[in-house]
Amino acid sequence: MSFTEKPAVTKERKEFYSKLESHDLAPLWEVLNEVVTTKPKSNCAPHLWEFEVAKEFLMEAGTLITAKEAERRVLILENPGLKGLSRITTSLYAGLQLILPGEVAPTHRHSQSALRFVVDGGGACTSVDGERTTMQVGDFVITPPWAWHDHVNDSDKPMIWMDGLDLPMVTLFDTSFAEGYGEDIQEITRPNGDSLARYGANMLPVDFKQKGLSSPIFNYPYERSREALEAMKKANEWDPCHGLKMQYINPLDGMAAMPTISSFIQLLPKEFRTQTYRSTDATVFSVIEGQGKTRIGDKVFFWKAKDTFVVPSWYPVEHEASSDAVLFSYSDRVAQQKLGFWRESRN
């Protein structure tokens, strides 16, 4: 017996297994090599979604159903290896949400942690627990678990962002709760930008008391993130596997900005090719700027601004930028690290 071989099935064993089944029992040795694998094994598949194709379908959806009727008008980025499960990886969800000028996505809250990464348009607002923020392309916005949130588009342009949630994790633990607010728009009790000013300047209020596990900042503006990357670029210090890669953090503890999802931004200079890398956290990428290609296992995907692609767990990956490129990404790394599962391999 080993982790790669199953014991032979004899007539006597087969009869025994049939008797076990009628009593809701099963022999571990028949499935051990499937539940304890020698390396990560998943149905999650490498894939790329072209934004222009998805946008066309989103705009068509906008003619068929309102944001209010749908609660959230979203097209799920469903991994082709995980059909029917509403997942982009085994543990994470992704979707593209459209909100048209004048529309409101009503206030609600739920157990799931959510991120919004703005892909197209600009000027729409998200409100979280009494504070409203105006969103622009490249902004990383957090909705903590059980926080009231709504979306309003007072601009004259459609806006599309990527939703990233830990839906499969919450489903795994059977811990999903959700409720509506009763009104479309929640009461605004704090000025726009309050949380960034209060917690995003290397200071904290003297009487601060932590609430929850998420970052108290809920909008990380792309303008500031891009400036940081540009300044660090001058040092000419490039990680061979990542280029210049930074993690969005919770200023209270320096850890990931969200309790179950790690989020990153990275710069790949023109003609930079990363060395082979793999890690156990399947990762979703959204291209902010530039173009290039990524080899995932034995497949090569060519990408450009606004496209989305996914790298499954433990697949070897190499990025190559044909122009200066900036990528946003998110994964379940922080959850894996807290549980002692996470592993990486370079070269």
UniProtKB/Swiss-Prot annotation:
pH-activity relationship: Optimum pH is around 8.0.
Documented effect of changing G164T: Loss of activity
Bilayer-crossing regions: none
Induction record: Shows relatively high basal levels of expression under non-inducing conditions. Induced by aromatic substrates, especially 3-hydroxybenzoate.
Necessary cofactors: Fe(2+)
Domain of life: Bacteria
Reaction(s) catalysed by this chain's protein: 2,5-dihydroxybenzoate + O2 = 3-maleylpyruvate + H(+)
Activity over temperature: Optimum temperature is 50 degrees Celsius.
Phenotype seen when the gene is deleted: Knockout mutant can still grow on minimal agar plates containing gentisate as the sole carbon source but GDO activity cannot be detected in uninduced cells.
Effect after changing K338Y: 1.5-fold increase in relative activity towards gentisate
Summary of subunit composition and partner proteins: Homotetramer.
This protein's name: Gentisate 1,2 dioxygenase 1
Protein's organism: Aquipseudomonas alcaligenes (Pseudomonas alcaligenes)
